């Protein structure tokens, strides 16, 4: 009996212990599941927060982009509004001041024909109003509201050389004497004017270069443009020959006006014989217009108004047909002959044109200089180019003496017309 009670008691204890252990395990499992659920919910919450942050960032970027577009559209709208306002403003009448009457009144000749006595706006400085000035007039009251700049021919502005030619004095051979004279007349007065002041003389104003075609007249002018800091204006004589009356003379006047404004400056007139030929009695309408242009050129070169630091270089291969008026001192103070080079000059020119060429050892420049008697600088350059073409034709990267012989033979065959020697200076002044 006692044993059975003992067994029953032990079983109850074990059952109770098992029940408690089961409860503990169940609580642990419940806690673990709860933690897992909480962790899962936390991860889901973080994912939602990250997604919302990404959407917020995207919306902020879109907002900034829209703000930029809005700002750009506002700017364009403002520009268009201003343009519309300008288009609504009535046009102004252009007139020319004829006379000044009092402080705030001027006589103006309008572009439509009649002249008016008009008032001057307080926004315009009366000192800027002088006879000949172009002004803007209000369409209704004809009040002077603005002063226009001087009218200039765009063709004169286009003749100004912005980029300097890549030619220096060392690139010219056989013309040492001519280079010395041109530097004395052009460079020295511009760079060292005090030397002439000390001696008490006025520097020469102009140079005329004459000689056969291809002797280097234009090349000398290019070297002057490179070596000086002066404004260089290049004009071809035929550009001054115009169709309508007074157009050529007006262009000459504008060229010299531009040169004076940009002083120190150099005006180079190439092929000057196109407008400076001798004047004759037998004239057509075109000849008369050329003579008007010539007379304007003569007046600008040595007229009533001082020319200032403006130097003139003329070039021609027909000095015998030039008008004596343009050759007198005061217009062209020095008349420099640029002849065909002698043997020494031809050798120097050949050295200049072959210094970048890949020459064979058998090339003898002295012999080539002897073979090319009567050739000018342009023909010597053509010989060097032709010799290089002969080497390329033979698939070689160097030039031999035989290439030069063939080139000389080819160029000399083309030289059929002998260049006439220029007339003597005494004949020019008669």
From Swiss-Prot:
SMART domains given for it? AAA (SM00382)
- GO MF annotation list: ATP binding; ATP hydrolysis activity; CTPase activity; GTPase activity; proteasome-activating activity
Q: Which GO terms describe its biological process?
A: proteasomal protein catabolic process; proteasome-mediated ubiquitin-dependent protein catabolic process; protein unfolding
Q: What is this protein called in UniProt?
A: Proteasome-activating nucleotidase
What PROSITE patterns does this protein map onto? AAA (PS00674)
Tell me what effect the entry lists for residue 430 to A/W. Answer: No effect on PAN's ability to stimulate gate opening. Still associates with the proteasome
Query: What gene is behind this protein?
Result: pan
HAMAP family reported for this sequence: PAN
According to its UniProt record, where is this protein located? Answer: Cytoplasm
